[in-house]
């Protein structure tokens, strides 16, 4: 049923992105505002250089067990950039990748989203939610 379906049919085009020099606090705020759990990290020419997830942000957050004051914590947090905690070697797909192959990659590598790269440039992102949306819509259309 989905053998001929490609990523480009279900991916989110022009996803919300962040630059490597952005502060972690800015990336976190952007994730909250846009209700996304991951941000592709792009260079000035829109090439993909990494990805940052809400999990990465949480791991970089100060521990409650720290002995630093709130002011020291806020200062350190404000200095931390996306580049310091992003994943650099990102698994990607192309717009023409079969959607089932993308789903298989997500399962195999235990990741919930894949940046879509076309000609070295970020073209979109495909996530678990996109796959679920495809399944639900196909079920509705076959009733």
Give the label of every model feature segment:
Residues 6, 23, 98, 121, ...:
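Residue-level recognition of oxygen-bearing side chains
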Residues 14-17, 47, 92, 121-122:
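Short, flexible active-site loop motifs that bind/organize anionic cofactors or intermediates
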Residues 18-35, 41-43, 83-86, 92-110, ...:
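The conserved cystathionine-beta-synthase
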Residues 25-29, 49-53, 67-73, 98-101:
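Short, functional N-terminal and low-complexity linear motifs
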Residues 31, 39-55, 106, 114-130:
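A glycine-centered beta-loop-beta connector
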Residues 36-37, 43-45, 66-69, 111-112, ...:
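Short, charged/polar low-complexity linear motifs in solvent-exposed/disordered segments
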